UniProtKB/Swiss-Prot annotation:
Pfam families: ASL_C2, Lyase_1
Gene that this sequence comes from: argH
Record SUPFAM superfamilies: L-aspartase-like
Protein family membership: Belongs to the lyase 1 family. Argininosuccinate lyase subfamily.
Subcellular localization, as worded in the UniProt entry: Cytoplasm
Gene3D superfamilies: Fumarase/aspartase (C-terminal domain), Fumarase/aspartase (Central domain), Fumarase/aspartase (N-terminal domain)
Keyword terms of this UniProt record: Amino-acid biosynthesis, Arginine biosynthesis, Cytoplasm, Lyase
Protein name: Argininosuccinate lyase
EC supergroup of this enzyme: lyase
Keyword Cytoplasm: yes
InterPro entries: Arg_succ_lyase_C, Argininosuccinate_lyase, Fumarase/histidase_N, Fumarate_lyase_CS, Fumarate_lyase_fam, Fumarate_lyase_N, L-Aspartase-like
Lineage of origin: Bacteria, Pseudomonadati, Chlorobiota, Chlorobiia, Chlorobiales
GO annotation, cellular component aspect: cytosol
């Protein structure tokens, strides 16, 4: 096992007559955070060195030495045999110093035509690309679970809510597909973001380019980027792709948090619509009867962390003059935490959802004679040519009567209905059934069972 430290001179120290203060170095060191980028750093350096050799800036022999050394260092870091120390300042220094130990002075050629500015920007984009793809895959897995649930519960009737008040009976499948579409847009955002992320900044150097005959397009090709930077200042001095990634993650977490809130409410005794498997619930250390939806609550809580990271990044960048500033080093903690938190939240939420069951018998009883069928009365009258505003007014009076008399809407006699409007006939009772209400929906994308079946087929094609 190798423990790195700064017994050697820091990469930038030759211009200074005094050693860097140890407390200042400890304060500015980022290696404990950016060590997570070691794979991307080695990948970027390998491409850069390959390009340098192809352009004749270093020899093929030197390139081979450096690349072999980088591979060995990568294996050491992967296995935990090379342990970065805070005195090494950052992971880039760790790798270069270890390379020098392995191959000598040739290691110094790795940085020809390159600054840590474009090096870090490249590492960050490679990291973002990987995390975007990982998150996209996790979201796709969650969508598959949603499709499965929608298929299972396509004809299960639940309440649709507005203002957290029972509104209209709907298909449970329709509910699950609503979240499918929200996560579909989140995946679309990630796909669109990838177009901006997958542009190489390597070759911009510090910010003004280099006098060496670099070939940034070749470096980009080796790293599987779609293109190369247009402006060297812009390439190293913005973190808008980091901000955009965290913004997309914030929306993903917002959707998860809303979904989690429903599961928490529905699994409560007061609602009793849904059962969470014991494998995904916790109890109380004091109250033996408790069964808590902790996983859903944690997802809801972690949403705040991701929102906080977005504000952190916007605040870091808001007043920075061009081009690079050391403030930008602080982008790593919010970026890494956001990626890890969001991907883990999506993955665990999918597993949680798989282990939930709707209480169909209870839902059937609750939806059978509820006031949520009032809209059906209004639309019944509209079909009889009564203007909707008048139909709404009549229905409101019927609802008041139902509440005051303690009679359900299907329990009101025809004679009483006709005191509110002579348009009522015996066929009103056919409309006052949740299943009939759902089947009667005719509009595109509605909650009717047939519409949900169409939506399901579309969802499967998208997956």
């Amino acid at each position: 096992m190798f423990f790195m430290s700064n017994k050697k001179e820091l990469l930038w120290q030759s211009r200074f007559s005094e050693p860097f203060d140890r407390d200042a170095l400890r304060f500015s060191s980022s290696v404990h955070v950016d060590k997570a980028l070691f794979r991307e750093d080695i990948e970027g350096s390998t491409a850069h060195v390959t390009m340098l050799a192809e352009e004749g800036i270093i020899s093929e022999e030197e390139s081979g030495q450096i690349i072999r050394g980088l591979r060995e260092i990568g294996a050491e870091l992967e296995a935990g045999d090379l342990v970065p120390h805070w005195e090494d300042e950052d992971i880039h220094t760790v790798i270069e110093n270890r390379l020098k130990e392995k191959i000598g002075a040739t290691a110094g050629k790795i940085h020809s035509g390159r600054s840590r500015n474009d090096q870090v920007a490249t590492d960050t984009r490679l990291y973002l690309r990987r995390q975007i793809r990982t998150l996209g895959t996790a979201l796709q897995g969650l969508q598959k679970t949603l499709v499965s649930k929608a298929e299972t519960y396509r004809e299960t009737i639940i309440f649709g809510y507005t203002h957290l008040q029972r509104a209209q009976p709907i298909s449970a499948g329709h509910y699950y597909l609503a979240y499918f579409n929200m996560f579909r847009r989140d995946r679309d955002r990630l796909t669109d973001l990838l177009k901006r992320v997958n542009i190489s900044p390597l070759g911009a150097a510090a910010f003004a380019g280099s006098t060496l005959p670099l070939n940034p397009a070749r470096s980009a090709e080796l790293l599987d980027f779609d293109g190369v930077f247009s402006n060297s200042i812009d390439a190293v001095s913005d973190r808008d792709t980091v901000i955009e990634f965290i913004s997309v993650c914030s929306m993903v977490m917002m959707h998860l948090s809303r979904f989690a809130e429903d599961l928490i409410l529905w699994s409560s005794y007061e609602f009793g619509y849904l059962e969470i498997s014991d494998a995904f619930a916790t109890g109380s250390s004091l109250m033996p009867q408790k069964k808590n939806a902790d996983i859903a609550e944690l997802v809801r809580g972690k949403t705040g962390r991701v929102y906080g990271s977005l504000i952190t990044m916007l605040t870091i960048m808001k007043g920075l003059p061009l081009s690079y500033n050391r403030d930008m080093q602080e982008d790593k903690p919010p970026l890494f935490d956001t990626a890890e938190t969001t991907i883990e939240s999506v993955s665990i939420f999918g597993k949680l959802l798989e282990h939930t069951t709707l209480k169909e018998e209870r839902l059937a009883k609750l939806t059978a004679d509820d006031l949520s069928l009032a809209t059906e009365i209004a639309e019944y009258l509209v079909k009889k040519q009564l203007p909707f505003r008048d139909a709404h007014r009549v229905t409101g009076r019927i609802v008041s009567h139902s509440l005051m008399s303690g009679t359900t809407l299907p329990g009101i006699t025809l004679d009483v209905y006709r005191t509110f409007s002579e348009l009522f006939e015996s066929d009103i009772y056919a409309a006052l059934k949740p299943e009939a209400s759902i089947k009667a929906k005719k509009t595109h994308g509605s909650c009717s069972f047939d519409s949900v079946a169409i939506q399901l087929e579309e969802a499967k094609k998208l997956l």
